[in-house]
UniProtKB/Swiss-Prot annotation:
One of its GO terms (molecular function) is leucyl-tRNA--protein transferase activity. This is Leucyl/phenylalanyl-tRNA--protein transferase. Keywords: Acyltransferase, Cytoplasm, Transferase. It comes from Erwinia tasmaniensis (strain DSM 17950 / CFBP 7177 / CIP 109463 / NCPPB 4357 / Et1/99). The gene is aat. Its EC number is 2.3.2.6.
Amino acid sequence: MRLAQLSHESLNFPPPDRALREPNGLLAMGGDLSPQRLLNAYHRGIFPWFAAGDPILWWSPDPRAILLPQHFHLSRSMKRFHQKSPYRVTLNQRFRQVIEGCASDRQEGTWITYEVKLAWQRLHELGHAHSIEVWQDEELVGGMYGLALGQIFCGESMFSQGENASKTALLVFSRYFLQQGGKLIDCQVLNPHTQSLGAQEIPRASYLSYLHSLAFRPLSSECWSPQRLF
């Protein structure tokens, strides 16, 4: 099957079920990272991922990795650590620093290019993208960022420069998101780290059904206000 080439004039995407099986989920290439195109993509279960120097590639893998916040897996060792945690956790206080941390945390190169950083910073300024920060004293030691779609949060990346810092970010955010009425955290593709924290795979069609029913159910406006979570 020929890979769809996106134009700069149209925000349309092919249906996700046209994505390739190998590599799993590759759907289209080209276009741009404008806020409108990114929001259009995520509302359709599509996200960009590409290496520096490559064209923009768009993906919708099958199966899809998700985390139901109420099913976050808290190991006994992590529970003990969290009970005596040296960290505090905040929301939307250092978005730029979090995305820089995620980019620099990749030892073998990163897909978080300058172009990607600018695109996500713009989404943050528009109120769509959000960051969770983990602090030890006044040092930022971990965090995560992603996109809010109603009762769904699309997690993009996380970083850790302190013991269990990224786990702390996801743990605290999962509890907060659930309390605020959040239903699902999109993890895109399953990896050992997110699987250990309770992420699971579901069919792409099931994820698209979640999107259809949850993405346009807004949370309270105060949900994303800069604040301390833990």
